[in-house]
Amino acid sequence: MKKTLYLKFILAYFIFGVFGFIIVTTFVPNMTKEHLIREKAESLYSEATLIAGTYAGGLYTSETTLETVKMQLDSLAVYLNSEIRIINPSGRLVLDTNSPLDVENVVVIENFDSTVTSGSYYIVGDFFGNFDSDVLTVFAPITSNYKVKGYVVIHTDMNDIQKSCNSLLNISYITLAILFLLSLIILIFFTEIVYIPLRKITHATEQYAAGN
């Protein structure tokens, strides 16, 4: 019976490890990814809001030129490792840091809808079919005389966020492995302090009962 109890204890130890691994691989990836998305979106939205109130806002009050804003946003886009756009409410692309200025050829984003965020300030997707893969997109309105004149839109590749997520997941797996190894101490203590002495006592009792 004591041997059966010990085997059950070992089985419980391995079940703990299996369930810990299942929980980490099932729940942690989505939780980590959502956290990174929200964190990145918040950071980009702060930048977009700043741009809307300074560089981009100056375009609609004739305080600066399109060329000047383009140069400033190009540098900022490199720093943020993102693509920055200024888009009119109609969907007409005013400026794109990934493309040179071309005022003669008007680019319109089909089906552009600034309300797609549904009360939030970011979305994840291909941005109305503009990208081949998913991007994280944040919107910040450009206002003048209490009217929305356009939007500062910042895109960042979801692959970069996924890479960060994978790095954090590797840390989670390593942490789980360390906890599993540390919990082995409990098994060792149980074996040395409880199981082995109990087995010796049981053996001695059996020998005494047998007249030895």
Write out the residue ranges for each language-model feature:
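Glycine-rich acetyl-CoA-binding "A-motif" of GNAT/NAT acetyltransferases
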Residues: V148
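Cytoplasm-proximal transmembrane signaling helix
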Residues: C165-F190, I196
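Transmembrane alpha-helix boundary/anchor motif
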Residues: I23-F27, M31, T156, I185, ...
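Membrane-proximal alpha-helical signal-transduction linkers
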Residues: I193-N212
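A short beta-strand signature within small-molecule sensing/ligand-binding domains used
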Residues: F131-P141
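Extracytoplasmic/periplasmic sensor domains and loops in membrane signaling proteins
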Residues: K70, V94-S133
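Helix-start (N-cap) segments at beta->loop->alpha junctions
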Residues: L59, T143-N145, V153-Y173
